[in-house]
Amino acid sequence: MEQYKKEFIEFMVDCGVLKFGDFTTKSGRKTPFFVNTGFYRTGAQLRKLGEYYAKAIHDAYGLDFDVLFGPAYKGIPLSVATAMSISEHFDKDIKYCSNRKEVKDHGDTGILLGSPISDGDKVVIIEDVTTAGTSIGETMPILSAQGNVDVVGLVVSVDRMERGQGKKSALKEIEENYGIETTAIVTMKEVVEHLYGKPYNGKVVIDDQLKQAIDAYYEQYGVEA
């Protein structure tokens, strides 16, 4: 596992984004872990988060693209922070763009925020955690309306590696339904691999009991890597 992935996993723990315990998802599943990206709340945290996204994008897709598109609302700061990080660490000036959920009737009435998207642009979509394809289903028509746009791929922070309504993961369903590549900074398999049985800040984050609960969850809801 790459070093930046290990650092990102620990970063999520430090920020309180990655939690372990007893949770219930929106779909009603009982889960022993939860990822809440709403806990990235400071400038320093967003700067680091942008760095991890930038490295994941560079590894998966390279930098031969024009625009980072972050769907409203959580994708807005992600697109900004990551575009800044790509400029700083890879010396590549990438445009950022997001959409409005509400239509304005005054001033700038366009649906897009940030850079416009032009015919022929190559776009990478950036999101937080994808557990269903709802957001991408709203995003693709917005991009298509801008012209002949080439969607290079989708990047999320964590791939939960669990089934949606069918037998495949949400990211795999997106790949098949929309014909685009997907990637994540880390997968939950990598999270467990890095944290299981190892002390971090004086505490073992994933002990044997929690590991058994995670294994049982994936026995019921998991997908193949």
UniProtKB/Swiss-Prot annotation:
It is an enzyme of class 2 (transferase). GO terms for cellular component: cytoplasm. It catalyses: orotidine 5'-phosphate + diphosphate = orotate + 5-phospho-alpha-D-ribose 1-diphosphate. Keywords: Glycosyltransferase, Magnesium, Pyrimidine biosynthesis, Transferase. NCBIfam families: pyrE. PANTHER family: OROTATE PHOSPHORIBOSYLTRANSFERASE 1-RELATED. This is Orotate phosphoribosyltransferase.
